[in-house]
Amino acid sequence: MFWGALLSMERPTSVRDLCMSLKLSLLDLSLACKFCGNNITNIEKLLFDKAGFQLIWRENNAFGCCQYCARVCSVVEQCFGSHRHLTSEELVNVTKTLQQLSLRCLGCLSILSEADKELCAELNDFSVVRGKTRGLCSLCRLPP
């Protein structure tokens, strides 16, 4: 979608800010996935912001990322990047306290909540992928 009205303004980085800038509701906003080109569903628009992702701008067009492509990106990172297990003790020794860390989910790449980080610490369930520490969020822990 062309966002010509935003040429003179700073480009929004979240779906919410884009809706506010264009004075559109979330339901009326049409947003394509940068990777597959499909339109992102309304639920995926909400999850995009919850995950802490930022809109990608190309030639005055805003793009997001659908859930399927976020998961594929995570799998590709795990397959082609270095990947190792890390205990919570090692993590805190190497970095700061758990609460100060900004961690993403190993499955969907969303930012982990404090509860998710605590569960990962209890289970000693952290991974390092391409130099970045990851754990599983509560949604990715659900059985298929």
Curated annotation (Swiss-Prot):
Record-stated family: Belongs to the papillomaviridae E6 protein family.
A single MF term (Gene Ontology): zinc ion binding
Name recorded for this polypeptide: Protein E6
Metal-binding is among the record's keywords: yes
Compartments (UniProt record): Host cytoplasm; Host nucleus
Keywords per UniProt: Activator, DNA-binding, Early protein, Host cytoplasm, Host nucleus, Host-virus interaction, Inhibition of host innate immune response by virus, Metal-binding, Modulation of host cell apoptosis by virus, Transcription, Transcription regulation, Viral immunoevasion, Zinc, Zinc-finger
The protein's assembly and partners: Forms homodimers. Interacts with ubiquitin-protein ligase UBE3A/E6-AP; this interaction stimulates UBE3A ubiquitin activity. Interacts with host BAK1.
unnamed zinc finger segments: 33-69, 105-140
Gene Ontology cellular component list: host cell cytoplasm; host cell nucleus
Record's function text: Plays a major role in the induction and maintenance of cellular transformation. E6 associates with host UBE3A/E6-AP ubiquitin-protein ligase and modulates its activity. Protects host keratinocytes from apoptosis by mediating the degradation of host BAK1. May also inhibit host immune response.
GO terms classed as biological process: DNA-templated transcription; regulation of DNA-templated transcription; symbiont-mediated perturbation of host apoptosis; symbiont-mediated perturbation of host ubiquitin-like protein modification; symbiont-mediated suppression of host innate immune response; symbiont-mediated suppression of host type I interferon-mediated signaling pathway
